[in-house]
Amino acid sequence: MRMKQLYAPTLKETPSDVETVSHEYLLRGGFIRKVAAGIYTYLPLGRRVLLKIENIVREEMNRIGAQEILMPILQPAELWKRSGRWDDYGPEMMKLKDRHERDFTLGPTHEEIVTDLVKNELRSYRQLPLVVYQVANKYRDEIRPRFGLLRAREFIMKDAYSFHSSWESLDETYELFKEAYSRIMERLGVKYMVIEAETGAIGGNASHEFVVPAKIGETNVLYCEKCGYQASDEKAEYRGEYPVEEEEEKPLEKVPTPGVRTIEEVSQFLGVPPSKIVKSLLFVGRDGYVMALIRGDLELNEAKLKSHLKDQSLRLATPEEVLKDFGVPIGFIGPIGTNVKKVADHSIKGLKNFVVGGMEKDTHYVNANHPRDFKVDEWCDLRTVVEGDPCPVCGEPLRATKGIELGHIFKLGTKYSEAMEAYFMDENGEMKPFIMGCYGWGVSRTMAAVVEHFHDENGMIWPLSIAPYTVIVDILNMNDPDQKRVGEEIYRALLEKGEEVVLDDREVSPGFKFKDADLIGFPIRINVGRSLKDGVIELKKRYSKELVKVSIQNGLGSLFEALNRMKAEYDPREAIE
C-alpha cells in the first residue's frame, strides 16, 4: 500500500470531545470516524486492526472446538419475555417496533436466540457438549457514550455459548475458555488480570472477567499481593469482623434536623460519627419496594443487592416516587414504621443507639436499635470493598486498581434452558434442562484497550500481532531519484516476501512523514534518506530512539536479515516498563 493511496486522513488537532488517549489517537491516526455519539465508522487502518483481532479470537475459539455461526441482530421480544429479561435487562436495551407493532430488540447479547435454536435441534446427551460462537455487532443504548470505542452504543463482540449434560462438562469447557482467553491476551502482548466477577443481567452462578489494567478503566479491581485473590469491586466479599457495641439501649427519640439530608450533614448537625448513622436506601424491584440498610460510613454495593434478591431490574427509587408513596422527602427515609422488605448489611448488626431517618420531613430518630424498633428481614454482605479492606482469603490488606474489561465468561447453569423449556434426554431416558455457559469478548474495545496500554506522547505503538501494517518505508526526499528508486525496490521486495508494508511516497517533509508514522504506530520504519549515498539505510523500532544502520551495497539481503532480527526482538512492553 502506498501512502498516496491509503485512506488514512490524519489530524493535527485533537477533537474537542475526546476524553481518552485511545479515542484521540484512533481519531487523529485515521482509524475511526464518529457518526453519532457512541457510533463509529472504521476506516481502512482500523478495519485491518479489527480483522487481526477477530482472527486471533477465531483461531483460539476453533482451537478449543467451538464452531462459528451467525445469529440475527434483530430479535423478537417474545424470546426475551420468555426468559424474563425483556423488563429485567434495563434501559440499555434498544427496543423497537415493526410496522405491525410487534416488539423487537437490537441484540445486546444472544442467550435467548441460541437457546431457542438449540432446543429445536439437540435431543440427546450424545449430542453434547456443543460450543458455538459468533463475531457480530451488538447494541446498547448507553445513557452517556464516552471514551470512544470503550463505551459505544454499537460495538463488535465475539460471543460463545456452550451446552452440556453435566456440571462437570461445563466446568471443563469453562476452563478451556479461561485458557483460550489467556492465550488471546498473551498474543496481544498486554498485561492482564483474571478476576472474579458479578454475573449481572446475564445471570448464572460463577463468572470471571479478563481485564487490562488502565487508569481510565471502568472496572474497579481489588487484589491481594500475598495470596493472589482478584475480584471486581462488585464481586469482592467483605469477611472482616464488625464490632459489637456493649452500650445499653437508650429510649428512641425523634429530633428536628431542618434541611439536613446527607450523611455528612447529619453527622455534623447531631455530632455523631457517620459510623453511628444507618443509611436507608429505597429500591424499586420486580416485587415492589425494598429498603437496603448499611452503616453510614460505608458504600452500598447495588450489584450485591441485585444478586442477593435475584432481581436485576432493581433500581433506586426516585425522589418523586418516595414522596408520592411514602409522603416524605427522600433524605428522611428510615426503617422505623416503614412497611417494606428490609435487607441489611452485616455492618449494622452490632450497632447500638444509632441514627436513622425520621420518616417525616426535617426529622431523624436517634437511639434507634434493632430488633426493638424495626425488623430486618434478610442479612447479607452489601458493602463495597475498598483498598485496605482485608482479603477474604488470607486477611491481608487488599490493593485496588482499574482495568478495561475485554473478556467475560459465565457459568449460566439452567437459567435460560429452564425458562425457555430447552431440554434433552439423558442416559436414563429422563428429560433434563441443558446446563449452559456463555463467553464474551469485546473485539472493538480490544483495539482501544491496546492503544491505552501501548502509546507514547507521539502516538500509538501497535504490537506486531495486530498492527495494521508491520513496516513503513519512508522515502525522505521524493526529488532524489536514487532514494525514490531504492525505496521502490525495497517496497516491492518486501511485498514479494509477504510483508505487510506501506511506502510513504508523498511529497512532504521527512518530519511530516515521521510524525504520521509515529502517530499511526507502524512497528518498524525503514528510512531511505541522505545516508543512501554511502549505501546505507536506517531501521527503527516504533518505541526506540535507536537507528540501526544497514549497508545495502551488496544487495537487500542484509536488510532482510536486520528486519527479521528486529521483528523477533520487537516487544512494545519495553515502551511502558
Swiss-Prot record:
Q: What Enzyme Commission number(s) apply to this enzyme?
A: 6.1.1.15
In Gene Ontology terms, what is one molecular function of this protein?
A: ATP binding
Task: List the GO biological process terms.
Answer: prolyl-tRNA aminoacylation
Write down a Pfam family by its short name.
tRNA-synt_2b
Keywords attached to this Swiss-Prot or TrEMBL record, sorted alphabetically, are:
Aminoacyl-tRNA synthetase, ATP-binding, Cytoplasm, Ligase, Nucleotide-binding, Protein biosynthesis
Main localisation, per the record? cytoplasm
Q: Where in the cell is it found?
A: Cytoplasm
Cited InterPro entries? aa-tRNA-synt_IIb, aa-tRNA-synth_II, aa-tRNA-synth_II/BPL/LPL, Anticodon-bd, Anticodon-bd_dom_sf, Pro-tRNA-ligase_IIa, Pro-tRNA-synth_IIa_bac-type, Pro-tRNA-Synthase_IIa_type1
Q: Look up the record and report any one GO term of the cellular component aspect.
A: cytosol
Write down the chemical reaction(s) this protein catalyses.
tRNA(Pro) + L-proline + ATP = L-prolyl-tRNA(Pro) + AMP + diphosphate
The free-text domain remark for this protein reads: Consists of three domains: the N-terminal catalytic domain, the editing domain and the C-terminal anticodon-binding domain.
PANTHER family, A to Z: MITOCHONDRIAL RIBOSOME PROTEIN L39/PROLYL-TRNA LIGASE FAMILY MEMBER, PROLINE--TRNA LIGASE
Subunit relationships: Homodimer.
What's the family?
Belongs to the class-II aminoacyl-tRNA synthetase family. ProS type 1 subfamily.
Protein function: Catalyzes the attachment of proline to tRNA(Pro) in a two-step reaction: proline is first activated by ATP to form Pro-AMP and then transferred to the acceptor end of tRNA(Pro). As ProRS can inadvertently accommodate and process non-cognate amino acids such as alanine and cysteine, to avoid such errors it has two additional distinct editing activities against alanine. One activity is designated as 'pretransfer' editing and involves the tRNA(Pro)-independent hydrolysis of activated Ala-AMP.
Q: What is this protein called?
A: Proline--tRNA ligase
Q: Which species?
A: Thermotoga neapolitana (strain ATCC 49049 / DSM 4359 / NBRC 107923 / NS-E)
Upper taxonomic lineage: Bacteria, Thermotogati, Thermotogota, Thermotogae, Thermotogales
